[in-house]
Amino acid sequence: MSKIVIKERRHMMTISYNKLWKLMIDKNINKTKLREEAGVSSNAMAKLGKNESVQLEVLAKICKTLDCNIEDVCEILFEE
């Protein structure tokens, strides 16, 4: 699985959407239903599945649909 890698001085950061997939299981919603209800593209969902960069607007739509905050769907992982 590819990751978003951001180099910042001596630290590496990756963005993970694993929280999103867990939340979807908890709320009993699949990717197709989320995509349709949130109004996001198939391309955006595919990028999320590969931990690739997506626009903040996509995450905002998903959060609104799932009635959650952004920290409930993604996290930044710091590596040294």
Give the ranges of each region predicted by the language model.
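A short, Lys/Arg-rich alpha-helix, primarily the initiator
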Residues: 2-31
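Residues in the helix-turn-helix
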Residues: 33, 44, 72
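Short C-terminal boundary/hinge segments that cap the last helix of small helical domains
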Residues: 67-80
